[in-house]
Amino acid sequence: VTGVQTCALPILVIIISFNLPFLMEEYGLSSGRAGILISLFFLAIMAPGFVLNKIVQVLGRRIYMVCLLMIACGMGIILLSRSEILIALGCILNGLSYGIIQPLIYDKTSDVAVPHKVTLALAFVMAMNYVAILLCPFIVDAFQNLFHSHSQTFAFWLNLMVALMGMFIVMKQEKLSL
C-alpha cells in the first residue's frame, strides 16, 4: 500500500459527501434529501467492519479489485440514475468499498511498520487520509478547470475513471482477471 493509494482512496469516495447535493439539484431532485443519502454512505462505511474477516476470506487477493469495481459501479449508478433509490444504491456501494479497503490499509501499515514505529506509521496514514479529504475539492476543481467542465457530474465521472484505472493497475500487479 503506497502513500498514493492511501490518498487516492478517500478522494474517490468522499466526493459523495461534497458533491451529491449539487448533483441532485442538477438532476432536478431535492438536494435536501442528499443528507439522507450521505448518511447511508457513511453507514455503509461502518457496516463491513462487522464481517470484515469473512469478506477478506471470500475475496482473498481480489479484494482491492472488487472494491474498486464496486466504487466505479456505484459512481456509474449515481451518474446514470435520476432515482433517489438508485442513487442510494450507488452511495452504499461506495461506502461498503471504502469500509472494506480502509481497515485493510491500516492493517497492512501495522504489518510493514517497524514494531516500535507502528503508532507513528498509523498516524501518518491517518494524516494522509485527512489531507486527501482536505485537498479533494481543490483537486477536483483543478481537473474540472483543466477540462473546461461546469457540470456537477464531472467529479463523479472523474472518480469513476480513476477507480477503473486503479482496478486495472491492481489487476496487472496481482496478475488477476475479471
In which residue ranges do the predicted regions lie?
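Helix-to-loop junctions at the C-terminal end of transmembrane segments
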Residues: 47-60, 144-145
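Short, small-residue-biased leader/transition segments that mark boundaries at the very start
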Residues: 2-9
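Short amphipathic helix-loop junctions that connect adjacent transmembrane helices
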Residues: 18-33
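Structural signature of the two symmetry-related core transmembrane helices
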Residues: 62-77
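A membrane-interface helix-boundary motif in multi-pass transporters
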Residues: 140-162
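Intracellular juxtamembrane helix-capping segments at the cytosolic ends
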Residues: 100-113
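A late C-terminal transmembrane helix in Major Facilitator Superfamily
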Residues: 110-148
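Helical-face signature of the major facilitator-like transporter fold
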Residues: 10, 83-95
